[in-house]
Amino acid sequence: MKRPIKLRSRGPTRNGDERVKQSGPERRFNNRRLIGRASDRRSKMIAFGYYGGKFSHLDFLLPLLPTTFAHFCEPFGGSAAILINRPPAPVETYNDLDSEVTNFFICIRDHGDELIRLISLTPFSREELVKACRPEPSLSEVERARRFFTRARQTRTGLAQTSSEGRWAHCVLTSRAGMAGAVSRWLGSVEGLPQIVQRLQRVQFENAPAIEVIRRYDSEATLFYCDPPYPHEARGDSKAYGYEMTDREHEELAEVLRSVKGAVAVSGYRCPLMDRLYRDWIRVDANTRLCNSSKGERKESLWTNYDPESSSQTAGYGLTDKNMYLFERPTRYGPRKHAQKSR
């Protein structure tokens, strides 16, 4: 029986991060193997802001999610920032338990011209936000989608979940492009919608519990990217998501993910709960950043049951020099040692 390797901290890295003490060989994430051609780098798309959304982490996450699988499935879809910024997979599934979010994406896919026209005619107005925040069960699906987008894009926080009548994002002195900064951002968000319409044409949508979707679409050719609500111990606010998860629900999710045939990647803040649930999976850490909800530092991490360092799985992406990530390989992998290439 081999004796465990005794590691010692080597101090901060050149970008200020502390190296990780780990049970396997300590290494830097090899970004050179993942640098793609300049023509492969795509402009980033975003439909709306979302608490816990991964738009700001695209440079970190996309190189770690293999593009070789036949099916890409997001059980916790949220703003779909990961899905719409990936190259299309042969089969793609988006799921979210919030029917307002799924209704918006379905409407913009199936009624894109009409919805974009209505949104473009919507003034940047406090009254529009007030109207959008008041539920009316008799609304059409398209009008529901328009009001959802208004809530998401005209609120002060810029997050769909935290919109309210008193949070209209008006400006006093800030200007941009010859107009109030908030108005400019609103118009810019509308201009970006046609690209998103085109990208969503090939996506199938679900509005169901995440575990139900995982079991339904599990196969050896499926890559699940799971971005569940951050555990409560890793953040300061307790009601940031429309649908929260308890620690027990996180445990149930981990039990299911450990039993699937497919490859799995799980996003989250590092905390004792996540480290315990995915202790024998590979973990990659992003640079430490400030967490607004707790006014402290939080480390965004990705846990995988496959080896994300394999260059054949992540061709076409590049890591920028400013994003150097820590890579931790445990002594043993989880239920799956390497992602299998779909046939």
Regions found by a protein language model. Give the residues of each.
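Conserved acidic-Pro-Pro-aromatic motif
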Residues: 220-302
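Short Pro-Cys-Gly-centered "Cys-loop" motif that presents a nucleophilic cysteine in a tight turn
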Residues: 1-39
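SAM cofactor-binding core of SAM-dependent methyltransferases
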Residues: 63, 68-135
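Flexible, glycine-/basic-rich loop-and-beta segments that form/coincide
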Residues: 308-342
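Short, polar loop motifs at secondary-structure junctions
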Residues: 76-81, 192, 268-272
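SAM-dependent nucleic-acid methyltransferase catalytic core
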Residues: 28-57, 67, 109-239, 252-255, ...
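Short, well-ordered beta-strand micro-motif
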Residues: 150, 302-305
